[in-house]
């Protein structure tokens, strides 16, 4: 899985990836994001996850998103998901993530 991370503003991170966010890829995806946030000279408080090319999300992927949400919430930050497919959105809704995550 290729994960592209780029700062769009001082405190904003934009993440795009392609493929399946499952057991094989979720840990790598989450680790790359967390490492980028921790290694940044600036405090990253807003993260946008672009799901345009994510074809599937498993419970492992959902766990990574939840951990990222909790990390950002501690810093009064936000996480926003955009271009989420209907299949992925049904997974988010099934576990109640649509109640606290921002979707665009």
What are these regions (language model features)?
Residues 1-16:
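Short beta-strand/loop segment at the start of cytosolic alpha/beta domains
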Residues 21-100:
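Amphipathic alpha-helical interaction surfaces in cytosolic regulatory modules
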Residues 102-104:
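Short acidic-hydrophobic, aromatic-tinged amphipathic segments that line or gate anion-handling sites
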């Amino acid at each position: 899985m290729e994960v592209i991370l780029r700062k769009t503003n001082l405190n904003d991170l934009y993440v795009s990836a392609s493929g399946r966010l499952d057991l094989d890829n979720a840990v790598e995806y989450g680790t790359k994001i967390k490492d980028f946030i921790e290694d940044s000279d600036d405090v990253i408080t807003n993260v946008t996850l672009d799901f345009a090319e994510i074809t599937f999300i498993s419970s492992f992927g959902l766990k990574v998103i939840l951990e990222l949400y909790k990390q950002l919430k501690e810093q009064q930050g936000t996480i926003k998901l955009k271009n989420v497919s209907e299949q992925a959105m049904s997974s988010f809704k099934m576990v109640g993530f649509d109640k606290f995550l921002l979707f665009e």
